[in-house]
Swiss-Prot record:
It is an enzyme of class 3 (hydrolase). Its main location: cytoplasm. CDD domains: EF_Tu (cd01884), EFTU_II (cd03697), EFTU_III (cd03707). GTP hydrolase that promotes the GTP-dependent binding of aminoacyl-tRNA to the A-site of ribosomes during protein biosynthesis. Residues 136-139 are annotated as: G4. This is Elongation factor Tu 2. Keywords: Cytoplasm, Elongation factor, GTP-binding, Hydrolase, Magnesium, Metal-binding, Nucleotide-binding, Protein biosynthesis. SUPFAM superfamilies: EF-Tu/eEF-1alpha/eIF2-gamma C-terminal domain, P-loop containing nucleoside triphosphate hydrolases, Translation proteins. Belongs to the TRAFAC class translation factor GTPase superfamily. Classic translation factor GTPase family. EF-Tu/EF-1A subfamily. InterPro entries: EF-Tu_GTP-bd, EF-Tu_GTPase, EFTu-like_2, EFTU_2, G_TR_CS, P-loop_NTPase, Small_GTP-bd, T_Tr_GTP-bd_dom. Pfam families: GTP_EFTU, GTP_EFTU_D2, GTP_EFTU_D3.
């Protein structure tokens, strides 16, 4: 069967549902799918199709996630929903499903619960830029004052984690009633969709960001100079552009004198392409795998950062035993392993396989990094954890 052609005529935005267990994330996902399909066209997905999330592997970690798509008049959305709390933690830390914005689902019958807080904290740590709140099960609360209290509580909680709690959209609705086709509650789903359209800005495309290419290999071509190869992560590099070589050693500047792809000479290399870049006056020994080539000033090398880490369970092929402070694994960034030491939060003595934890990492040599960069933790080439740079310290 031929796949439907992917129409790229609308901006594409990635979103997802987050929130406490049983607050109605999957029901809301189904309600959005149904109401928007009914209103704007498209295919509706049922609760059971979404809830039966297929198992995926991302960097060796088993994650269950459901992906659905829907349209509003101006945008195309890809929406991710996870069945279990552990799946959310893994998903957000590995960046398996990068979110341009999240819909925080809070049952108005319960108010914010422990996982509500944890998902907000994770969103802050992994750099989810925007949150919209959907207060669910409002059909079960008769008291308008109670709804107001829950809304205040959620807004305060978001402000506590540096989200603009006072200004972000909060929609009071009932996912189940909307799914059952009751017009007053369907209207709330449309209101939510309008909030997604207006509150989450259109994401910047990779190609519009400053140029960056992780260096995978280095060759010297006699009579031409040194060529570095890799896949362009973002931006565009053109022949004649000044570039920096960042990470591991002192940052140096050079000029791109040629771009090659599949043995053909090109004028430029773009995000997503594997290419070779010829560097002016750079010696073979001046560059190595693990460094990055970037637009001057766009990224800096760092050694110390706060991170949010998920430690693989034994079943996922991770460690069988906990680790303690003083643990010195390798941290794999983009194309290379760098040894580092860890500092655990106060009062935490050990970390068990299957845990997620905030830790401060100090690398033995600097690596080009931004907040939001993903990494793997490895021991002798085997992945034992996944993490994300939450905050750069030095």
């Amino acid at each position: 069967m031929a796949k439907a052609k992917f129409e790229r005529n609308k901006p594409h935005v990635n979103v997802g549902t987050i929130g406490h267990v049983d607050h109605g994330k999957t029901t809301l996902t189904a309600a959005i799918s149904h109401v928007l399909a009914k209103t704007y066209g498209g295919e509706a997905k049922d609760f059971s199709q979404i809830d039966n999330a297929p198992e995926e592997r991302e960097r060796g970690i088993t994650i269950n996630t459901s992906h659905i798509e829907y349209d509003t008049p101006t945008r195309h959305y890809a929406h991710v929903d996870c069945p279990g709390h552990a799946d959310y933690v893994k998903n957000m830390i590995t960046g398996a499903a990068q979110m341009d914005g999240a819909i925080l689902v809070v049952a108005s019958t319960d108010g914010p619960m422990p996982q509500t807080r944890e998902h907000i904290l994770l969103s802050r740590q992994v750099g989810v830029p925007f949150i919209i709140v959907f207060m669910n099960k409002c059909d079960m609360v008769d008291d308008a004052e109670l709804l107001e209290l829950v809304e205040m509580e959620v807004r305060e909680l978001l402000s506590e984690y540096d989200f603009p709690g006072d200004d972000l959209p909060v929609i009071q609705g009932s996912a189940l009633k909307a799914l059952e086709g009751e017009p007053e509650w369907e209207a709330k789903i449309i209101e939510l969709a309008e909030a997604l359209d207006s509150y989450i800005p259109e994401p910047e495309r990779d190609i519009d960001k400053p140029f960056l290419m992780p260096i995978e290999d280095v060759f010297s071509i006699s009579g031409r100079g040194t060529v570095v190869t890799g896949r362009v992560e973002r931006g565009i590099v053109r022949v004649g552009d000044e570039v920096e070589i960042v990470g591991i050693r002192t940052t140096t500047k050079t000029t791109c004198t040629g771009v090659e792809m599949f043995r053909k000479l090109l004028d430029e290399g773009r995000a997503g392409e594997n290419c070779g870049i010829l560097l002016r006056g750079t010696k073979r020994d001046d560059v190595e795998r693990g460094q990055v080539l970037s637009k001057p000033g766009s990224i800096n090398p760092h050694t110390t950062f706060e991170s949010e880490v998920y430690v693989l369970s034994k079943e996922e092929g991770g460690r069988h035993t906990p680790f303690f402070k003083g643990y010195r694994p390798q941290f794999y960034f983009r194309t290379t392993d760098v040894t580092g030491t860890i500092e655990l939060p106060e009062g935490v003595e050990m970390v068990m396989p299957g845990d997620n934890i905030k830790m401060v990492v100090t690398l033995i040599c600097p690596i080009a990094m931004d907040e939001g960069l993903r990494f793997a933790i490895r021991e002798g080439g085997r992945t034992v954890g996944a993490g994300v740079v939450a905050k750069i310290i030095a």
